[in-house]
Amino acid sequence: MCDILLNVLNIVFIGIAIILVIIC
């Protein structure tokens, strides 16, 4: 369960980083 949660958080964090790069 913890591994799945960490994976989801990782994907969300990477997605936010990509969006910030596109905006900037």
From Swiss-Prot:
Identify the keywords attached in UniProt to this record, alphabetized. Answer: Cell inner membrane, Cell membrane, Membrane, Transmembrane, Transmembrane helix
Q: Where are the transmembrane segments?
A: 4-24
Lineage, top-rank taxon, reads Bacteria
Q: Main site of residence?
A: membrane
A cellular component term from Gene Ontology for this protein is: plasma membrane
Induction is noted as: Expressed in both exponential and stationary phase; expression is slightly higher in exponential phase (at protein level).
Q: Where is it localised?
A: Cell inner membrane
Q: How does it sit in the membrane?
A: Single-pass membrane protein
**Name of the featured protein:** Protein YahV
Q: Which organism is it from?
A: Escherichia coli (strain K12)
Taxonomic classification, please? Bacteria, Pseudomonadati, Pseudomonadota, Gammaproteobacteria, Enterobacterales
